[in-house]
Design a protein with these regions (language model features):
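Gly/Ser/Thr-rich loops at beta-strand to alpha-helix junctions
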Residues: 2-6, 25-29, 64-65, 127-132, ...
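A substrate-binding/cap region within the structured catalytic cores of diverse enzymes
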Residues: 41-119
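C-terminal functional extensions of proteins
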Residues: 119-122, 129-186
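Acidic, Ser/Thr-rich peripheral helices and adjacent loops at domain boundaries
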Residues: 37-51, 141-149
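Membrane-embedded segments
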Residues: 1-38
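Short beta-strand segments
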Residues: 23, 60, 124-126, 172-173
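A general structural motif
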Residues: 99-108, 127, 149-154
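Short amphipathic alpha-helical segments and helix-helix/interface helices
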Residues: 5, 9, 104, 108, ...
Length: 186
């Protein structure tokens, strides 16, 4: 989903909106899944090159428990090294949770700290990060696009927490569905 991340950053910049993000190293088969080209590494290159403004306020390994716990030992260690290096390049904390619940809490603290008391106008979830979406089977029925808090009940991730606070939610996950809905050619 690096294209969605970049499009979101560009849209926020064009609108004069401050983007606050927590970026994950691990990704699915939809891009940003090669060492050297994970999203946090791409973001660092784009920021260093003056292409986009910094958005990430923290970097996580991603995957299970936001700690790449679903990866084999060597791959988990690589994800951790990439997380740490990208966090240094971006000048933000590296999140090191010990559980799913801690991962959600660390992300929420990062968002609240960066917002500095200002209200969050919209929460945009790009991709399928477990800490953001939760790990309940209910998440599979949430859909894509603007979703209601009712659809998120029982998911327990960061997205559900923001929905419970009355923050509008935009899910950018099923790109094909979004393109068909809005008449965008594939």
């Amino acid at each position: 989903f690096p294209g969605l991340n970049l499009a979101l950053a560009a849209a926020c910049d064009a609108l004069g909106v401050r983007l606050i993000a927590v970026s994950s190293v691990t990704a699915s088969t939809w891009g940003a899944n090669q060492p050297g080209f994970t999203w946090p590494e791409m973001e660092a290159m784009l920021v260093e090159g003056g292409v986009i403004r910094p958005a990430s306020v923290a970097v996580a390994a991603g995957g299970a428990a936001d700690a790449a716990a679903d990866l084999a030992g060597e791959d988990r260690a690589l994800a951790s090294r990439i997380r740490d290096a990208a966090a240094v390049r971006l000048g933000v904390p590296a999140l090191r949770p010990g559980s799913f619940e801690e991962a959600v809490g660390l992300r929420l603290r990062a968002y609240r700290r960066a917002a500095a008391g200002a209200p969050v106008a919209l929460y945009v979830n790009v991709g399928g990060a477990e800490a953001s979406m939760g790990h309940s089977p209910a998440i599979l029925g949430v859909g894509t696009g603007f979703v209601t808090g009712r659809a998120l009940r029982g998911t327990r991730g960061v997205t559900a927490w923001f929905a419970e606070q009355g923050v509008p939610i935009l899910m950018l996950l099923n790109v094909r569905e979004l393109a068909l809905r809005w008449g965008v050619g594939l």
